[in-house]
């Protein structure tokens, strides 16, 4: 057998061994809240199929030699599963959003910032919510800048399940104002005529988004943390974000 044939055979065997080793390791369980919308995550029939988080989480798992199992779940279910160690990684989360601490988890570096904005329609005559105004919001989400007005009844929450539903109801004139994140707003507007687009009034909050990783022996925690740093330094994180802007 020639030297070149031996080299090709060696490469094939190495690939097969790597694939076998990956198959023997348990899949990493990534939590995805069902309220997430594009461009962060595309969810079809209860399954995660694309978006920023899909690409990020798939790449993270690949870099540590694991498969990614993405679990689309209600927000409260995610919190409960994390408390019981049933989630390995959760991305698209900020420390300020968690009700209770998770001592068995470690935070990664932030991979982006989420900017929450107050939104209305392009043809609205007034650009500030009046007393008693209904505001489109996502069920279970907190909005610190508006919380006092919600608690006093000066503004009224109109909760729906997902980010894109908030904007769809605003466009359909079910209410005149809503809160969304800037990325989801831009995605919603991308194919609309100028007079049909929803417009940003003001930014009401900004939070760093990171991944929180279970720190147990069956999870390659440090390898995942290093992978995030490497993806940041190599420009992979920026490249993923750029695909959806």
Residue positions per predicted region:
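Bacterial N-terminal signal peptides
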Residues: 8-18
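Extracytoplasmic small-molecule ligand-binding "clamshell" domains
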Residues: 24-101, 130, 137, 159-160, ...
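Periplasmic-binding protein-like
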Residues: 34-36, 112-117, 190-229
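Short beta-strand-to-loop elements that line the ligand-binding cleft
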Residues: 67-74, 155-169, 201-202
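Ligand-binding clefts/hinges and TM-proximal coupling segments of bilobed small-molecule sensing domains
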Residues: 67-69, 145-161, 229-245
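Short helices/loops that flank or line small-molecule/ion binding pockets
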Residues: 71, 76-88, 164-184, 191
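A ligand-binding cleft/hinge motif common to bilobed small-molecule-binding domains
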Residues: 80, 92-102, 176-205
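Flexible hinge/capping segments at coil-to-helix
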Residues: 115, 119-138
